[in-house]
Amino acid sequence: MTKAQQLLPLLQQLPLVMRESGLWQQDAPSTEELSSNEPFSVDTLKPEQWLQWVFLPKMRALVEQKMPLPTGFSISPYFEESWKSCPEYAPVLSLLVSIDEVCR
């Protein structure tokens, strides 16, 4: 099974788990907020906004277009730190750890 085949179901699950955890947003951030150059757009977006509006669309596009996937990254530590006082987000964190494992 290719990395893309392993990653696709995880990316499809992410919006569902985010909705169940109350993290999914209906309204997109502004173009200005989305154009941040900072890692995780920390200066303009909440962690869940970056996940929904930046990470997820980019990763889906890479998989759908059969482009090379990034490797050697780990996003879960950022979210673990950001949400350390939010145990209700544990299902999302678990999924992010799985995504990290596929992309190593």
Language-model segments: which ranges?
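N-terminal intrinsically disordered, cationic/polar leader segments
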Residues: 2-34, 38, 73-76, 84-99
